[in-house]
Amino acid sequence: LHFDGMYEGSLFYGTRFDDSLSVDKLYREGVITENDITDVDKYVKEKLSYILHGDINHYDGLKRIRNKEIAKRMGLKNTPYFQTTENGLISQYRMSSGECLLISLLHFIYNALIRRSLPVDKPILMLIDEIELALHPVAVSRLIDLINSIMEEHENLVVYLSSHSPE
């Protein structure tokens, strides 16, 4: 069984850690340069900022590897994001677990649904396990609001969420 647009963003194993050590090493050794990095899409920056902090500008310094081809050339499976700090860049893998997972989820949503890389005439199934994991309850509520608004705009989208939270 094949699903287009499959993304697994596990917290403890799986794709999240495939690139973690590689990205740190590539950045530390100067392999990842300013030419390889660009500002993130406004959608991802603003949604991440709002969901986690209640404003749309908190992650103004968020960057990402320019494209999949550059990431693949570096041996990376994903397109990592970076936050600008006084001391340089911090990869999403060194940010909080909630930030890291939400960046990956928003990247997927933006590319698959907003930019429409997935077909609009076929059903899209999105499964999000333990949506509350590593997120503040207010952030979970804001994320669910975003998912609801996306579902209203995309009739072919079905989303299933799981939670172990009593809230």
Regions found by a protein language model. Give the residues of each.
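Switch/communication elements of ASCE P-loop NTPase nucleotide-binding domains
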Residues: 93-167
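Extreme N-terminal leader/anchor segments
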Residues: 1-16
